[in-house]
Amino acid sequence: MAEKFDYVNKIWDIADYVRDTLSQAEYNKLVLPFVLLRRLENALEDTREDVLKALNEHETDWGLDNDNYCNASKRSFYNLSNFRLKTLGAIDTLNNFMAYINAFSPNVREIFENFDLENTATKLNKAGKLYEVCKKFGSFDFSPEAVSDRDMSDIYEHLIEKYGEAIAEGAEDFMTPKDIVRLAVGMIFANDDEIMNNDTGIVRTLCDPTAGTCGFITDALDLLEEWHKDKQMKAPAKIVPYGQECEGQSWAMGKVNLLLRNVAAKGKDKYDKRNDLSQHILLANTLTDDKFENMYFDYQLSNPPYGKKWEKEKDSVQEEAELGFKGRFGAGLPSISDGSMLFLQHVVAKMKPADEGGAKAGIVLSASPLFNGDPGSGPSTIRRWLFEKDIIDCIVKLGSGLFFRTSINTYLWILNNNKPNERKGKIQLIDASDIKTSMRKNRGKKNCEISEDQIAWIIKTYVDGHDHGKSVIVPVEDFMYRRVTTQRPLRMHMVIPESFEFKDDLPYLSQEGKNLVYGVVAKYIGDNPYKSALQLSKELKTTLAYTIDKLPKRQKSFFTPKNIVKWLFNNFGVIDSSYEAVDLKGNPIPENELRSYILINPQNIITDSNLRDYEDIPWDTDFDEYMQKEVLPFTPDAWIDKTDTDEKGSMPDHKIGTVGTKISFNQYFHNYEAPKSPIEIAKEIIQLEKELQSFEADFLK
């Protein structure tokens, strides 16, 4: 019957009716709460008289806010009013409407508060339209008999897509498409025999820290029911949902989704309808306010916003990061421009420990967390921490065009802190970027979907651990490397001509001091280049001692022999590759002895900072072998600076080179495209020239 109900056009008629009263940006504040209100009203209709009877008999003892009324409503919510949307009356409509809303149980009232329903109703009432709007919504049949839970969920999804532009504004995507949800849910439940087949009533927890409208949670529950449906179990596994959402209207939608769960199940309901599945869906910012502190979950699902800044949460996040691994963000902090790796760390922190059975999680991320950040940076160290914890089980590259509000490629990360032995120390990469089906009609930017068969193929590839053209299983070390610094000797001669000017002055000196410098430098015209620099630096410091002594401490510290030599080279040095390298005393090092000198005493060679370079050496690769093969054939006077060690980030090992991490799908799934032939390119150039000539002719007419 739900398919016959043309809710899109009928609700659009109502939006059109109020267009002079509410702006288009406010339609969501009308459409969404009124649809939810009508669904609640329909769900309570059968037990309304029982609730009013309980109120009459027990109001003195129970008051108005008491869960005992749920025994009469047979739901996890209730309403103590005689009103319906169709019976509010044309006179005093606003007061009657608010009395009706305030007669709901507290868990429903807080939902409507976050929709700012009273303000919307007041605007409609002032325009004389509230009564008609209530009557129109009151005529819709959203009863459990007419609209199933799944159909109602579809209605919500379409309404959010059409009217929910203002919800979670600024987030790239607050609603995860169902095909992505079903894939993620299928992957975290895969190979879990207890959740699929246990008939002893086990209870498992599922949390979404970026709950949005609770699409992940509701579809996880739907899938579990589908799988259990044909098994005729007496006590199948039960999921208790938890979640947090910081945007009020998204939270309200998600809260209602779970509050109304199974209202259409009748006698086949596998849950106690008086059990409020929405009770653990809380309104709070996950990054700044962990509502489930010291709690750990069996499963987690999350689709955090892509590229969303976390500057508003900065103080709170940094404060927790200072706790190290006693907090949620001990591994490191990502760039302020994208907080998705904070959510990734949060999910890991909330996984049930392996010694208690372990946990699995699915989180949808953009490409950035795979490779962003230099070695030692926050993002790189976060990945390193995940590798060392051996918690990444699989990453699936999804195709473009799968989400409603972004066309970028996304990646589904599957986390598991209790991997089977054969998968320990490894990560499976699945390239599903072309595993999708075109849709007949676009929904926003979503023009493709993953079919049920395609979802099954991806899950089977994951479960079986297939290593084929679309899947590889790789040791975590393949995603790690060390960035080492390479140095080369300074090859320079210093020319002090008979007539000279300084290119730059020694800082902080008075004119008198600069004149002293000029006089000292003039005495060294034509001397040995390096020895002159060393002798000059000493004499300058002696000559300027009185002047320098008068300077503030911070300025005084500039005048070291090293800085003065650098200043001399900046003014008089000439790079010349034909010159020999020299040691710190200015002695030349014969070219045939340079390599031996480098191996024995490289720290005594004057280096050229302009030739300093970096090499990313794969993990466990011998440094000397790498240099012999990749560097020395091209720069035979280079060496690795062994003083540059791994000191950055939250887990330094103090070894040579800074540890870096990156996960590159292109390394394993690169599709080679042969370049165009010269003949084909020549034809294209000729065609472009003809088009250009034609354009010029038309332009000059």
List each language-model region with its residue ranges.
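Short acidic (Asp/Glu) and glycine-rich catalytic loops that position anionic groups and cofactors
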Residues: 134-135, 164, 233-236, 274-282, ...
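Flexible, glycine-/basic-rich loop-and-beta segments that form/coincide
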Residues: 404-504
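Feature representing long, continuous alpha-helical segments
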Residues: 218, 252, 302-304, 341-349, ...
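Conserved Class I SAM-dependent methyltransferase catalytic core
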Residues: 17, 26-39, 332-415
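Active-site lining segments that contact anionic ligands and/or coordinate catalytic metals
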Residues: 296-297, 338-340, 356-366, 389-393, ...
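Conserved S-adenosyl-L-methionine
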Residues: 170, 174-302, 307-309, 314-319, ...
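Non-catalytic, mostly N-terminal accessory regions of nucleic-acid modification and defense proteins
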Residues: 1-193, 266-270, 277-286, 397-400, ...
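Short, contiguous acidic/charged loop-to-helix segments that flank catalytic cores in large enzymes
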Residues: 21, 311-320, 324-338, 368-378, ...
